[in-house]
């Protein structure tokens, strides 16, 4: 055996021996291991030299492709100055510059930026800010949170407490604080199949919950326009705006989680722009650095910030912060990422690509085992079902989504399923030709797996 092949196999075996991969059953991984060695553009290459389309943007975050020169150069330039210094009590230039740019990019009422290292932490910060805000202004009864059924906001304890995906969260229930769960306006499988009816029913249920419990509710948290990990379900038109209006009516803070949806993913800078929504608190991560480094942020209003401002003896300080918060390398990457957005007018390109993808995905509705195709911008979910007419799902034990993504891998494309929902979230810079090729590969894999193996 050649030396190169020995080295490749060695990395694979070491991955099985030493690593514990996130959201991964390691028994499955041992049967189908994958070790990535490099990336270029929208492609990833494993240690065996096989190249794949990055069909899930390396978990929904890559924007311009891998090894984007401008971002690489920005990180190198920052390394010549300093890699990291703490943000606890001492600011740094990239963090200041990025905060200024984020304020410029987001709705005008958001004026303050609190950094963190991941989307889940950004959510934790949002929850803690909302909770402490009411205490700081003397409204101590407002301690509860409202979230949506099937929602997902990260995997830390606070984030799962406002999540509602049983397979992820049930085992940890004894650790979690209690939150109110409002129904999500799920159109697929609803008896009426009318988005307006579904929207109004969900808003009616939410208003009833608010009317009964508003005096104890600190905030409501929702994902921006589309539930990601819950199955790529798009909110009916007017729902998000309706939630905002109810929060205002009942004096409840409104948190929008844009971790997955922000930075162009839905065809707007941020998903809230689809309905001109103005949250009190907004979280961002994933695409903020173009998919390079772990930076996240929680943005809020001057009114909320002012509730924490005062003499130390007033005990209004927000006691939160991690060691690498506001890291200079990550902030430099994020600034370069946003500059590329602006220079290349990427939002306009994404809108054109989203239209193209919708046209390409239309034919999936003709497949025998595709029950629903859902899309907002370049966030897409294809739900596989046993019976398209009755919407009967596959038994979860058949793992049809997982098997289909393994077929896709064989063909040269990587993604991860959400149960039996195939996720298609390509890098935003993918060309029309690349999008067409990935969609064709995905369609072939669905047909091959569901027809021949299902």
Swiss-Prot record:
Its cofactor is pyridoxal 5'-phosphate. The keyword Transferase applies. CDD domains: OAT_like. GO terms for molecular function: adenosylmethionine-8-amino-7-oxononanoate transaminase activity; pyridoxal phosphate binding. InterPro entries: Aminotrans_3, Aminotrans_3_PPA_site, BioA, PyrdxlP-dep_Trfase, PyrdxlP-dep_Trfase_major, PyrdxlP-dep_Trfase_small. It comes from Anoxybacillus flavithermus (strain DSM 21510 / WK1). Pathway: Cofactor biosynthesis; biotin biosynthesis; 7,8-diaminononanoate from 8-amino-7-oxononanoate (SAM route): step 1/1. One of its GO terms (biological process) is biotin biosynthetic process. PROSITE patterns: AA_TRANSFER_CLASS_3. The record marks 23 as: Participates in the substrate recognition with KAPA and in a stacking interaction with the adenine ring of SAM. Pyridoxal 5'-phosphate binds at residues 119-120, 257. One of its GO terms (cellular component) is cytoplasm. Catalyzes the transfer of the alpha-amino group from S-adenosyl-L-methionine (SAM) to 7-keto-8-aminopelargonic acid (KAPA) to form 7,8-diaminopelargonic acid (DAPA). It is the only aminotransferase known to utilize SAM as an amino donor. The keyword Cytoplasm applies. This is Adenosylmethionine-8-amino-7-oxononanoate aminotransferase. Keywords: Aminotransferase, Biotin biosynthesis, Cytoplasm, Pyridoxal phosphate, S-adenosyl-L-methionine, Transferase.
């Amino acid at each position: 055996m050649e030396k190169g092949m020995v080295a490749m196999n060695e990395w694979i075996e070491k991955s099985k021996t030493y690593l514990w991969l996130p959201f991964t059953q390691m028994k499955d991984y041992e049967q189908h291991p994958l070790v990535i060695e490099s990336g270029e553009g929208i492609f990833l290459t494993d240690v065996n030299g096989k190249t794949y389309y990055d069909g899930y943007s390396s978990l929904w975050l890559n924007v311009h492709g891998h090894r984007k020169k401008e971002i690489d150069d920005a990180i190198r330039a920052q390394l010549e100055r300093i890699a990291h210094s703490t943000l606890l009590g001492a600011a740094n230039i990239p963090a200041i510059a990025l905060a200024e740019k984020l304020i410029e990019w987001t709705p005008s009422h958001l004026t303050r930026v609190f950094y963190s290292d991941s989307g889940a932490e950004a959510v934790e910060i949002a929850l803690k800010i909302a909770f402490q805000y009411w205490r700081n202004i003397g409204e101590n009864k407002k301690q509860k949170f409202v979230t949506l059924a099937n929602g997902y906001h990260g995997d830390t304890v606070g984030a799962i407490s406002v999540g509602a995906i049983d397979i992820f969260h049930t085992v940890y229930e004894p650790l979690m604080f209690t939150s109110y769960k409002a129904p999500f306006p799920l159109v697929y499988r609803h008896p009426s199949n009318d988005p307006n009816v579904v929207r109004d029913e969900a808003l009616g249920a939410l208003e009833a919950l608010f009317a009964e419990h508003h005096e104890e509710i600190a905030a409501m948290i929702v994902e921006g326009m589309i539930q990601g990990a819950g199955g790529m379900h798009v909110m009916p038109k007017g729902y998000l705006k309706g939630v905002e209006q109810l929060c205002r009516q009942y004096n409840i803070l409104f948190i929008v989680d844009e971790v997955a949806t922000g930075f162009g993913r839905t065809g707007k800078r941020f998903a809230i722009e689809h309905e001109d929504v103005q949250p009190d608190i907004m979280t961002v991560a994933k695409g903020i650095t173009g998919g390079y480094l772990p930076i996240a942020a929680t943005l809020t209003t001057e009114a909320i910030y002012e509730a924490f401002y005062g003499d130390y003896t007033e005990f209004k300080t927000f006691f939160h912060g991690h060691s690498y918060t506001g890291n200079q390398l990550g902030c430099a990457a994020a600034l370069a990422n946003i500059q590329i957005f602006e220079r290349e007018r990427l939002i306009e390109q994404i809108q054109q690509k989203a239209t193209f993808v919708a046209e390409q995905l239309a034919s999936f509705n003709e497949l025998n085992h595709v029950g629903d195709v859902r899309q907002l911008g370049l966030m897409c979910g294809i739900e596989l079902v046993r019976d398209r007419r009755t919407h009967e799902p596959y038994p979860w034990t058949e793992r049809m989504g997982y098997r289909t993504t393994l077929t896709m891998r064989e063909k040269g494309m990587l993604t991860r399923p959400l149960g039996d929902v195939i996720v298609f979230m390509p890098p935003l810079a993918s060309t029309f030709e690349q999008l067409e090729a990935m969609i064709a590969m995905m369609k072939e894999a669905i047909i091959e797996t569901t027809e021949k193996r299902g």
